[in-house]
């Protein structure tokens, strides 16, 4: 809906280029705004900056001159830029309007929105909703924090489509009129306190997701965190999910996902592993039911969706052994979730960059670990950990070598789990590269027929 006129002839300052700033600047120019882009980095050789300049958009880089505020612009801020940055801090003092580009996506599109936020699980929930839409004849376009710039996708959707948008707390701080038809808060734990300063500020940022909702909209949230999530501002119809008890919404009972007393699917038929993922699944299923996605499409998705790449991703089965790639587990909390996701014996591949951490906090989660294959800078620490718990420990040179060594010790029905609990930078440039090496090596060991 590029006939939106609310920004025509307005001065707008886009602070922070990156993908979202680039797309926001182009959109604002189409909407008739007088656009300036500012970035603290030198953009003199940046291709996107040159592209914007060719459109007549001013680009000021290398610093944040406060004179850019003299024409009282509306600020469109990159969500990763904290409010303590000089130009943003000064804009706040002057009372200037500060938005993020997801607000633009709402202003220009008539498509209903499913918005997903939370400390953990939001990417999985967003992706699963997208997969359920894909299995149906309906269209749900992914956008936001999941990697697709919301204001760009919003220009491409029809009013009959859904925008399925993942939102971080940073993005939610910059909304004014943004109103999802269906909002999901997966959970709220302590996080990003370096940005928000305290837990209360972080919680309030998450609650922004429902501040503009009305009685015709829906909020989906964790029943067991309802006191943290709900507030007097909440006007939407609230529905809950729970893996522990019957609730007004969706829940697990007798091993089935149940909605309004109707069994949808046996949890044993789900491909995505882990108790934490059960909550993610419940939230996604409920959102899709409310959006009109057929139950058959939902079931088709649940029996095939194996997760996000590198996040407890089901890679495949070799004979009776399932392999899981959790390379994104770069800290002990993520690995705790992974180890807690299986009842079968686990061969655990772990190790990586040594940041001076000890790993004793993983001991309570090692009950099902039968053997460990350790690698990287921390392999001695993990070997010590495994030996202290009476586990079989094998040392490997890297992830590829670890998968090779697994073949010597694997037994029927073992789960092979790469969950390093460490960053990858001692041996790999990214956790994605580490995960890809794991997958490649798994495939190399598949029997050829």
From Swiss-Prot:
Highest rank taxon of the organism: Bacteria
GO MF annotations, alphabetized: ATP binding; UDP-N-acetylmuramoylalanine-D-glutamate ligase activity
Record-level GO BP terms: cell division; cell wall organization; peptidoglycan biosynthetic process; regulation of cell shape
Compartment(s) of residence: Cytoplasm
Catalyzed chemical reaction(s): UDP-N-acetyl-alpha-D-muramoyl-L-alanine + D-glutamate + ATP = UDP-N-acetyl-alpha-D-muramoyl-L-alanyl-D-glutamate + ADP + phosphate + H(+)
GO CC annotations, alphabetized: cytoplasm
Pathway: Cell wall biogenesis; peptidoglycan biosynthesis
The protein's Enzyme Commission number: 6.3.2.9
Keywords tagged on the record: ATP-binding, Cell cycle, Cell division, Cell shape, Cell wall biogenesis/degradation, Cytoplasm, Ligase, Nucleotide-binding, Peptidoglycan synthesis
Residues reported to bind ATP: 118-124
Pfam family, one: Mur_ligase_C
Protein role: Cell wall formation. Catalyzes the addition of glutamate to the nucleotide precursor UDP-N-acetylmuramoyl-L-alanine (UMA).
Name the record gives this protein: UDP-N-acetylmuramoylalanine--D-glutamate ligase
Native source organism of the sequence: Staphylococcus aureus (strain NCTC 8325 / PS 47)
Lineage of origin: Bacteria, Bacillati, Bacillota, Bacilli, Bacillales
């Amino acid at each position: 809906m590029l006939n939106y006129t609310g920004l025509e002839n307005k001065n707008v300052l886009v602070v922070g280029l990156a993908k979202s700033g680039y797309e926001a600047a182009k959109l604002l120019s189409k909407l008739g705004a007088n656009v300036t882009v500012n970035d603290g980095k030198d953009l003199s050789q940046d291709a996107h900056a040159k592209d914007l300049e060719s459109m007549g958009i001013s680009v000021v880089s290398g610093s944040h001159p406060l004179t850019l505020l003299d024409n009282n612009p509306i600020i469109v801020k990159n969500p990763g830029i904290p409010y303590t940055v000089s130009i943003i801090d000064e804009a706040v003092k002057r009372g200037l309007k500060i938005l993020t580009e997801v607000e633009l996506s709402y202003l220009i599109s008539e498509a209903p929105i499913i918005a997903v936020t939370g400390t953990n699980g939001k990417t999985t929930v967003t992706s699963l909703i997208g997969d359920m839409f894909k299995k149906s004849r309906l269209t749900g376009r992914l956008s936001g924090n999941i990697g697709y710039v919301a204001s760009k996708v919003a220009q491409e959707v029809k009013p009959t489509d859904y925008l399925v948008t993942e939102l971080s707390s940073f993005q939610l701080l910059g909304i004014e009129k943004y109103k999802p038809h269906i909002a999901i808060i997966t959970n709220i734990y302590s996080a990003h306190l370096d940005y928000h300063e305290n837990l209360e500020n972080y919680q309030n940022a998450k609650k922004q997701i429902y501040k503009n909702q009305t009685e015709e909209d829906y909020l989906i949230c964790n029943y067991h965190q309802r006191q943290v999530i709900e507030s007097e501002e909440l006007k939407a119809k609230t529905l809950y999910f729970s893996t522990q008890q019957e609730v007004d919404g969706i829940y697990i009972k007798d091993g089935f996902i149940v909605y309004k007393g109707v069994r949808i699917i046996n949890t044993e038929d789900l491909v995505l592993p882990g108790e934490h993922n059960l909550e993610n699944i419940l939230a996604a299923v409920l959102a899709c039911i409310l959006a009109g996605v057929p139950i058959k499409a939902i079931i088709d998705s649940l029996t095939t969706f194996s997760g996000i790449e590198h996040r407890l991703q089901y890679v495949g089965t070799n004979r009776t052994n399932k392999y899981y790639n959790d390379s994104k587990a770069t800290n002990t909390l993520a690995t705790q979730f992974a180890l807690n996701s299986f009842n079968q014996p686990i061969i655990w591949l772990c190790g990586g960059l040594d940041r001076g951490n000890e790993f004793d906090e993983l001991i309570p989660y090692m009950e099902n670990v039968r053997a460990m294959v350790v690698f990287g800078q921390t392999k001695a620490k993990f070997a010590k950990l495994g030996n202290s718990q009476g586990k079989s420990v094998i040392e490997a040179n890297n992830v590829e070598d670890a998968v090779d060594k697994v073949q010597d010790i694997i037994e029927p029905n073992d789960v092979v789990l790469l969950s390093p609990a460490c960053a990858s930078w001692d041996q790999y440039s990214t956790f994605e590269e580490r995960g890809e090496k794991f997958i490649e090596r798994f495939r190399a060991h598949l029997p050829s027929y």
